[in-house]
């Protein structure tokens, strides 16, 4: 009789033997993603013979690529997960999920959220969790203008739009633009649900098979653990992809978006994702699905 250990080793050997083509791996150039993925793409953790071809894009581009099935493994918004979960399985590591880290709705002048109806609102993408939260907050809002997330504050400031939903490092810098925070959508979500806010997670194509997905999961979890234990190791890689961001903002970004939920979603993280997508289904924003999140 072959022991479980021998069977496991043989199975992993097969993964390495058949994985001759690198898997496409999508993530954003934001510091939290480059911080977490650095060990994986630079061979600092055991990938059991799987290699990766990295593709760095803003999160909405990644959402759209996943919608077309063009990436094997990728970061996506949890809003996008609601549209692709039949084809992609969620991984338990690598998520941006937590408290006090949600998108902000900002304006040039202080106005009441009720006065937004009929006004133009810049959003960072149709499949972003930022837009999903805004639609759950007020389903009557309709006049959205999609633009790259790093152009939204300027658009609000010069009056091209009446308001904007900002994400990523913009939450640390909007006050320097003289903008007003009308609403913290993360705080609103936490009050409404009592749960942390699920922003984005890592998914893998279900067609890769359970064994390969499990191997990717282990390598990603080990990579997150490596970076959290050795935070300075990825510094050059982070700054290579965030050249216009100063050290203080970079550190704040990583500190806010990389946490214990990034290591493992845990029960609370899974409940938060389920709650968000349940509400999105009930609102008719995403299709109803009975497929489990995980493989």
Q: What positions do the PLM features span?
A:
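N-terminal amphipathic/basic-hydrophobic helices that include classical n-h-c signal peptides
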Residues: 1-18
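A structural signal for short loop-to-beta-strand junctions that line the ligand-binding cleft
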Residues: 19, 23-24, 87-95, 120
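Bilobed "Venus flytrap"/periplasmic-binding protein-like clamshell domains
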Residues: 21-42, 103-162, 169, 271-274
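A local structural motif
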Residues: 45-55, 137-147, 286-291
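Beta->alpha turn/N-cap motifs
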Residues: 58-60, 69-82, 148-149, 166-172
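Hydrophobic/proline-rich hinge and linker segments of small-molecule sensing/allosteric domains
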Residues: 90-113, 190-207
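Pocket-lining segment of extracytoplasmic ligand-binding domains
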Residues: 149-240
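Secondary-structure end/capping motifs
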Residues: 209-279
